[in-house]
UniProtKB/Swiss-Prot annotation:
Gene3D superfamilies: P-loop containing nucleotide triphosphate hydrolases (3.40.50.300). This is ADP-ribosylation factor. The keyword DNA-binding does not apply. GTP-binding protein involved in protein trafficking; may modulate vesicle budding and uncoating within the Golgi apparatus. Its main location: Golgi. Signal peptide: none annotated. One of its GO terms (cellular component) is Golgi apparatus. The gene is ARF-1. It comes from the Eukaryota. PANTHER family: ADP RIBOSYLATION FACTOR-RELATED. GTP binds at residues 32-39, 75-79, 133-136.
Length: 207
């Protein structure tokens, strides 16, 4: 089983590297533990609608356009069998999105450990956007404390690149064009921050 997984991963990685080269979109790697909502977010960004999804086995890749912002987003599976391969993908992207299930604080510790396992092997700092998903499941008066807890648990002050923690709710997001959709605006604003940080990077590093 281990050899089969290794062969499959090598094939996926080879394809990944080939698809990255020559792309005009800014390439973003999206990782996080299973169940955090990565694939749901990716489909929302692509279609503007919320879809129920199944766990990602391997990776998904979608080109996403948000106004004038263009991204190539790679959604890498968060199951244990795929987490050990994150390091092969992470240095190919110019930015990182790390998804966290903020309604599951018992996994904050493990989630933070896995994030730092990746950050410690980056070949250069890059923008890190931590999306605290499922904020709708947290009482409103507790939400700021949850975000603070994630930043502290992840020890983001140690990271020498730009970082931001943004609470979102993908399942509660409505149409991206709705002026009353606070959840949708939070998601778009998070990507605006990421895009702004990417624009500060030399173009060769941001592709």
């Amino acid at each position: 089983m281990g050899n089969m997984m290794s062969k499959v991963n090598n094939l996926l990685y080879t394809k990944l590297r080939g698809l990255f080269s020559g792309q005009s979109e800014r390439s973003i790697t999206m990782i996080g533990l299973d169940g955090a909502g990565k694939t749901t977010l990716l489909l929302y960004l692509q279609t503007g609608e919320v879809h129920q999804t199944v766990p990602t086995l391997g990776f998904n890749c979608e080109n996403v356009t948000l106004g004038s912002m263009k991204f190539q987003v790679w959604d890498i599976g968060g199951q244990n069998s795929f987490m050990r391969f994150w390091h092969q993908y992470i240095n190919e992207g110019c930015g990182i999105i790390y998804m966290v299930d903020c309604a599951d604080p018992q996994r904050f510790g493990k989630s933070g450990e896995e994030l730092w396992r990746i950050l410690n092997i980056l070949n250069s700092p890059r923008p890190l956007l931590v999306l605290a998903n499922k904020i709708d499941l947290i009482r409103e008066h507790e939400r700021s404390e949850v975000v603070k807890s994630i930043r502290n648990e992840f020890n983001l002050e140690r990271y020498n690149g730009p970082s931001q923690v943004v609470p979102i709710s993908v399942l509660q997001a409505g149409s991206m064009t709705s002026a009353n959709d606070e959840n949708g605006r939070e998601i778009i604003d998070a990507f605006r921050w990421l895009n702004k940080e990417l624009e500060k990077m030399p173009r060769a590093e941001a592709l």
